Amino acid sequence: SEVMVLSHVLAAELEDARAGHNAEFTVEGTVPDVRVTANEMLSSVFRNLLNNAVQHNDSDHPEVTVSVDTDEDRVVVDIADNGPGVPDGQKTDIFGKGERGIDSPGTGLGLHLVYTFVEQFGGDVWVTDNDPRGAVFHVELPLAE
């Protein structure tokens, strides 16, 4: 693994997502200039989550909001959408191998890979409800020394 600048990785993936989707991607606040220990798969983590936020979105105007929060030793990236959300019973299951939305296309490997990579980086990933609707995926990563 190597030390990576989080804002660079995130900015590149957001640029690709904006180019590839008819959706609104907003960054709330500023992305702190922090470094994390990861590898090039960190890009895949954000790409998967940004793509999912649009692909599984049933809204006429998909909106995805990214925000980043940091403290002394970790950073949390939140990717929030205005889609159908994730039922409570599936919030842990969706990161399992081969799990996918009830009626959504795809191999179901996306979130499992996200979970696997984030765990390799010493981090954590989980999902909560967005308000008033949608899902928020949280990616927590330890800061590089």
Where are these regions (language model features)?
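Short helix-loop "hinge" at the ATP-lid/N-box region of the Bergerat-fold HATPase_c
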Residues: 52-57
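Acidic ATP/Mg2+-coordinating residue in the GHKL
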Residues: 81
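Conserved catalytic submotifs in the C-terminal HATPase_c
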Residues: 24-35
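Short conserved segment of the HATPase_c
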Residues: 86-98
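Short alpha-helical Gxxx[C/S/T] motif in the catalytic ATP-binding
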Residues: 110, 114
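Detector for a conserved hydrophobic position within an alpha-helical segment of the HATPase_c
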Residues: 117-119
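Conserved glycine-rich
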Residues: 123-124
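Short beta-strand/loop element within the Bergerat-fold HATPase_c
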Residues: 63-73
